[in-house]
Amino acid sequence: MQTDSVQVSPFDLASSLLNVKLTDVLNMSEELTMSPAMKMLVENRDILTLFTTTVAVLIGCVVVLVWRRSFTKKSVTNEVETMKIVVPKKEIKHEEVDDGKKRVTILYGTQTGTAEGFAKAFLEEAKVRYEKALFKAIDLDDYAADDEEYEEKFKKESLAFFFLATYGDGEPTDNAARFYKWFTEGDDKGEWLKKLQYGVFGLGNRQYEHFNKIAVVVDDKLAEQGAKRLVSVGLGDDDQCMEDDFTAWKELVWPQLDQLLRDEDDMSVATPYTAAVLEYRVVYHDKPDSSAEDHSHTNGHAVPDAQHPIRSNVAFKKELHTPESDRSCTHLEFDIANTGLSYETGDHVGVYCENLSEVVDEAVRLVGLPADTYFSVHADNEDGTPIGGASLPPPFPPCTLRDALARYADVLSSPKKSALLGLAAHASDPAEAERLKFLASPAGKDEYAQWIVASQRSLLEVMEAFPSAKPPLGVFFAAISPRLQPRYYSISSSPKMVENKIHVTCALVYEKTPVGRIHKGVCSTWMKDAVPMTESQVYSWAPIFVRTSNFRLPSDPKVPVIMIGPGTGLAPFRGFLQERLSLKEAGTELGSSVLFFGCRNRKVDFIYEDELNNFVKTGALSELVVAFSREGPTKEYVQHKLTQKASDIWNLLTEGAYLYVCGDAKGMAKDVHRTLHTIVQEQGSLDSSKAELYVKNLQMSGRYLRDVW
């Protein structure tokens, strides 16, 4: 029997829809050839509507499901990529979960890495002593992105320790400058840190006027703002043995932390802690891998800095002393054209130099491996887990042993006690090992102070005295030899006069140590021996960077300036005067200026004499006053000339003059400061306390600036 009904499956319907546009279906003419399924859809539009709606919903569900899976995968990928960042500027906040554990934050301000080393050593020992607490060590610059975040985070801290180095003339280190400015110069917040308990350890040198200023100021400010001081501020003195100062301070800290971090029923006695000798994982290579060569001096960073210096060629060099001199002073010019480097008058340049070849030869002999040994150092295990906690210095690029000893190893400084323990651990002679351990022990404190510190014995001399100590390369570079640091110089030029050059004025360091060794300054010797581009196709170059300074001329050129800089202390003032000459030539009105310069003898070491006279002749400098210490029957220094010009100096100060001092911090700068105090007291008819306040106000207002070392 025949029937008019047609049996249509769901697949037939779907096929018809997929092969024909919906608009075409709704407008099809009966004359067109249609499949049975299509005819049914056209004749039953209600079915068509229901079916298409169902299909649309199904397609929508599929799209949403695919999108969510894609988004989830992308989020996971982004999270993994974020974790790959080597040095994140902002802390990952997954530690904010309240798990009931007590947290201790360790913050450090470091210039050469010493404060960071102490902070991380403190962290490692504390982790062993207090296993139930969570410790983290953070660079002060990485702790917060801005002032608001500093405040937000400090409000949450309950226990913190600060390791703060004082740099230059009582200044914070580069990575602590932003924190220090916020914490000491901000609005008075009252006692807003009552929740915080803290300790501070400072790193400084007692020979300098502002000994440990940064640590002392931060310690006082914390207490003023309500925080509870756990122990007195530790005053580490690099002029003696800072490690002993650190140890003594820690012995005051542990009893306090015992009360805070140990359980009440914990009556156990802490096991004596012995720090592990740090060691890199070392991989030896048959030959240099060109893909692993050090390209750091091509930089690749937008702004060169201490971690990312830029290669700069030596463009020009000349000796500034006359042949009659028994000393040396080098004028050297770095070519910074097309390097991305720029600077302002008064800035500093940091220069990375290599150890002298004779020093490297001696170091290679004492290490006991071939100079062409090619290797790389790693701060992680083969499976990627970190080695030695948080204390290992950052690895340097793969290179030969000779290059590593030349570029990265400070082998001429006196070894720290931790280095002696590293040598002892790898001394095959038991007597030598015991002797090294004794020197590093509390019992050997006096002998260490005499045999190493006072005698200025270098690491190489100590290794020579203990020939059986042959540490492996991983130990030598991680625990024994400190990293060679950049040398900083006041730039002696102005970009307004020499845009593509950085000028440096450097006195040669050449002196005999108490044990008779001739010590040659690493960077000053390199500069003296440098070969400029104008003299050879094989010329000298160095990785350099610019460090911003607050040593600036007044923004108003009409403000008077007083400059005091004997010897190489003249360097930044040469830049000042170049800038003033440039302004003068452009028609700018200048305020009066006086320069106090000092040297031994006009015929021997009167550096830049012709230039200084020209500055006077052109009006860039109003008056040049020179003190010669070896010409007359009596020695005359810049402070004596200041006294002779006391009335003029006072008049300039009352007119709003800026006063600048550059040079030796331990001697000259102290003498000039005392002389200035006397001038203010006598010329201003003030008592001693008011004169001291006047000078302090000059400093606070930025009118008395010092660039001293």
Curated annotation (Swiss-Prot):
The keyword Hydrolase does not apply. InterPro entries: CysJ-like_FAD-binding (IPR003097), FAD-bd_FR_type (IPR017927), Flavdoxin-like (IPR001094), Flavodoxin/NO_synth (IPR008254), Flavoprot_Pyr_Nucl_cyt_Rdtase (IPR001709), Flavoprotein-like_sf (IPR029039), FNR_nucleotide-bd (IPR039261), NADPH_Cyt_P450_Rdtase_alpha (IPR023173). Its main location: endoplasmic reticulum. Its cofactor is FAD; FMN. GO terms for molecular function: flavin adenine dinucleotide binding; FMN binding; NADP binding; NADPH-hemoprotein reductase activity; oxidoreductase activity. NADP(+) binds at residues 327, 568, 629-630, 635-639, 671. Keywords: Endoplasmic reticulum, FAD, Flavoprotein, FMN, Glycoprotein, Membrane, NADP, Oxidoreductase, Transmembrane, Transmembrane helix. The chain crosses the membrane at residues 47-67. Residues 104-254 form the Flavodoxin-like domain. It is found in: Endoplasmic reticulum membrane. It comes from the Eukaryota. FAD binds at residues 487-490, 505-507, 521-524, 709. Belongs to the NADPH--cytochrome P450 reductase family. In the N-terminal section; belongs to the flavodoxin family. This is NADPH--cytochrome P450 reductase 2. It comes from Artemisia annua. The lineage of its organism: Eukaryota, Viridiplantae, Streptophyta, Embryophyta, Tracheophyta. The gene is CPR2.
